[in-house]
Design a protein with these regions (language model features):
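Conserved nucleotide-binding/hydrolysis modules and their immediate coupling elements
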Residues: 158
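Calcium-binding acidic motifs and repeat modules
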Residues: 7
Length: 789
């Protein structure tokens, strides 16, 4: 199903006995039900028992939509953008199932939901709304999925309501727990009896607690059933967690998160939770040490026997990580330590299953004692200079590499003390290196045959020697004045290297793509490019103001795409480019500043006839003769060309299938004769052409299927007879003076009509009221101001 769906669903008018309507194959990103479906078609299907509007992005529904649909038993609004349910939903006395999951804009339910006396299944998981009081009055409700309770200052009755709901399934969130007064009140929630809740979130916010013992008692009584699988505790205000949190009886608990318990000074004994796979501990500001208590007291089971991912973050006072050395974390695959500025203790030494290690913002943490990481694939270090030292010290690095024989990716960021990286001893398994913000780094000359897949250097001042890499990115290396691209490199990107002057290429380079951005002192491309880079297919130059010409001999013959932007001297000397020698060139883009008018008046600039896509900005001397020579041209983008009017009058290549005219301020009309020559044109887009007042009354190409007009402030109308019978889509956007559409109506071929920000036109197109509505009502997809009609 797609936008509007009127065309597909209008036949339902004749199916008054239809019992089930479940649209499938919804386009997830942008799909709406039209007003014609909601107002005219659905209310006629009075025999419907099951209706799904899932994934449609409508924000509003007619308030009386369900008045005539009283037989509905199943209704699905999941994944919609609906903000409010129609009040008429409360007349659906036969409704048994209502699905509202992932309705992220829905904030409340209708007040009289208790009238749904037969409602048995309600799913509000991941919806924005909070569960209202009156849901407890739904006596037939057997299954409530994804309930979210927001407690307030008068929370006693709310906890009682929660306690009365024995039919909770899936996820349950309880927010505002700071309003719970004592143990007796939290006991009313009856949490242990909620056997079908699998995901539980408990959240406190606001002021500090008056009594930490009371806070612990409250959490103690919120102990869930042992069937729980995921548990989130956020903002807990006690100083210590209750004992149940680490009880091995929680044999199904897989995912646990403890965050923002800023007064808590110890962690619970979590090591004996038998199935725990994912553990996050964040924002526990009073924790100074992870002690033996964290691992639990059992002597027969390895602590954290099932844990696969462990994250510590924002632990501002944490200093020591106590290690048992009893085989803890035997299957741990990912370890992340982030924002622990005082952590100085060592990590567990034998993490043989670890595949990804991330250390960030831990300035005191050191890895001077090698740890066993025999299966490590990814190692990321950021803002942790003492960890970075391990790469600087060849002996220490060699020792550590003995335990990292499977390493694939190395990422080092902002380790300012890092001065060297012993490339010669890097393992052959290493394929990706990213180094950023290490200003003192000087790479040694590689002496082995290591060849990476990716190498990225950002903010490293002197990368004089580089290992071979298939993909190479160098950015913001401000002290770099000359650069040799090594062999085996296939794609190269060089950005923001302010002092780069000389760029050269090693023999044997198989480069296919070269991008250079913002290197304003670079005065030339590598010499002998044609011979040294025979495989180059893509060249992009952006803001390289000192480059005046291409190398002697020209560009490589196999070049297919050339993009030149903000390279004034180079573009003004384009007569010497000799692009006509490039038989494979398909795509050419030139973004200029308009300074070529005097320099190249009367130019004779040649391009190869192989070009299929041409994009031009601010090029004043582009001629019609040159364009006509491009006999294979399919796409033309013309932005701010003062001569655009004459180019259209003199004619464009008849091979064009797509033409975009942007910001051509002198364009006042579209010449009929010039357009009629474009017999293959499918898509015409006109934008920001403020002098354009009208379209030709006749002469639009008979092949045209899509017409888009945007930001043309002086355009007043569309031609009475000028829209071709082939047109299937028309878009008009922000044309404030357009006040009419053709009186004869739209071509019958049109299936998509989009009109937005046209204030004079909008009243004429109002759904079921506007004067022009009868002439467009047959069009399957209509959007007026982004609203489906």
């Amino acid at each position: 199903m797609g936008d509007g769906d009127f065309g597909k669903l209008k036949t339902l008018n004749k199916l008054e006995q239809l019992r089930t309507l479940l649209p499938i194959n919804i386009q997830l990103r942008w799909c709406h039900l039209s007003k014609r479906v909601l107002h005219d078609i659905l209310p006629r299907l009075t025999s419907l028992r099951a209706l799904s509007l899932s994934h449609y992005k409508n924000e509003e529904l007619p308030n009386d939509l369900f008045i005539k649909l009283k037989h509905l038993r199943f209704l699905d609004f999941s994944w919609t953008n609906i903000k409010k349910l129609p009040d008429s939903i409360c007349v659906l006395y036969n409704l048994e199932t209502l699905l509202l999951s992932y309705c992220s804009y829905l904030k409340e339910l209708p007040l009289h939901m208790e009238k749904l006396i037969n409602l048995r299944h309600l799913d509000i998981s991941e919806a924005y709304l909070t569960t209202p009081l009156h849901l407890s009055k739904l006596k037939s409700l057997h299954v409530l999925v994804g309930a979210k309770f927001l407690l307030s200052g008068r929370s006693g009755s709310r906890m009682e309501d929660l306690g009365e709901l024995h039919n909770l399934y899936g996820s349950l969130s309880i927010l505002g727990l700071q309003h719970v007064v004592d143990r007796r009140e939290s006991l009313k929630a009856n949490m242990r009896e909620k056997k079908h809740v699998e995901r539980l979130s408990l959240e406190w916010s606001g002021s500090d607690a008056d009594n930490s013992r009371t806070e612990r008692d409250i959490l103690d009584e919120l102990q869930p059933n042992t069937n729980i699988k995921e548990l989130r505790i956020t903002g807990y205000r006690g100083t210590k967690f209750p004992n149940w949190l680490g009880d091995p009886s929680f044999h199904k608990l897989i995912d646990l998160s403890l965050s923002n318990g800023k007064d808590c000074y110890s962690l619970p004994a979590l090591g004996q939770l038998p199935c725990l796979k994912f553990l996050t501990i964040r924002g526990m500001h009073q924790i100074t040490e992870v002690t033996e208590e964290f691992y639990g007291s059992s002597s027969s089971t390895k602590p954290f026997n099932s844990l696969e991912q462990l994250e510590f973050a924002e632990m501002l006072e944490w200093k020591q990580w106590g290690v048992l050395g009893k085989g803890e974390f035997p299957v741990l695959e990912e370890l992340s330590i982030d924002g622990c500025p005082k952590l100085i203790g060592k990590l567990p030494e034998n993490l043989s299953s670890l595949r990804r290690l991330r250390i960030s913002k831990c300035p005191e943490l050191s890895l001077e004692t090698p740890i066993q990481l025999s299966n490590l694939k990814e190692f990321e270090v950021a803002n942790s200079p003492k960890v970075g030292v391990v790469f600087d010290d060849a002996q220490l690095f060699t020792s550590q590499l003995e335990g990292m024989k499977q390493i694939v990716k190395l990422d080092i960021t902002d380790c300012k003390s890092l001065a060297s990286l012993p490339i010669s001893i890097l393992p052959s398994t290493l394929k990706r290196i990213r180094i950023s913000g290490c200003r003192e780094l000087k790479l040694e000359a590689p002496i082995n045959a290591i060849c990476l897949k990716e190498l990225s250097l950002v903010g490293c001042d002197s990368p004089e020697f580089l290992p071979r890499a298939r993909s190479l990115s160098v950015r913001s290396c401000n002290n770099l004045t000359r650069f040799l691209i090594p062999t085996a490199t296939e794609t190269v990107s060089i950005r923001d290297c302010d002092n780069l002057e000389i760029l050269s290429v090693a023999c044997g380079t198989q480069m296919t793509s070269l991008h250079i951005y913002n290197c304003e002192k670079l005065n030339s491309l590598p010499e002998h490019m044609q011979q040294l880079l025979p495989s180059l297919k893509e060249l992009k130059l952006v803001n390289c103001s000192q480059i005046e010409s291409f190398p002697v001999g020209g560009l490589p013959f196999n070049l297919q795409q050339l993009w030149i932007s903000c390279c004034k001297k180079l573009v003004n000397g384009r007569k010497e480019w000799h692009l006509q020698r490039l038989p494979c060139l398909r795509d050419l883009t030139i973004h200029h500043d308009g300074s070529d008018e005097v320099v190249l008046a009367g130019e004779k600039w040649e391009l190869p006839c192989s070009i299929r896509r041409l994009s031009i900005w601010n090029l004043k001397t582009l001629s019609s003769q040159l364009l006509k020579s491009l006999t294979s041209l399919e796409y033309l983008f013309a932005n701010n060309l003062p001569q655009m009017q004459s180019l259209l009058e003199e004619g464009l290549p008849s091979s064009l299938s797509e033409l975009k005219l942007f910001r051509n301020h002198d364009l006042h009309s579209l010449p009929t004769e010039g357009l009629q020559r474009l017999t293959w044109l499918r898509h015409l887009e006109i934008r920001d052409c403020h002098s354009l007042q009208s379209l030709p009354e006749s002469g639009m190409p008979s092949s045209l299927s899509k017409l888009t007009i945007q930001h043309c402030s002086n355009l007043q109308s569309l031609p009475e007879s000028g829209l071709p019978s082939s047109l299937s889509e028309l878009r008009i956007w922000n044309c404030s003076n357009v006040q009419s559409l053709p009186e004869s109506g739209m071509p019958p071929s049109i299936s998509n009509l989009y009109i937005s920000k046209c204030p004079l036109l909008k009243p004429l197109l109002e759904f079921n009221k506007g004067d022009y509505w009868p002439k467009i009502a047959h069009i399957p997809t209509i959007f007026i101001d982004l609203e489906s009609q």
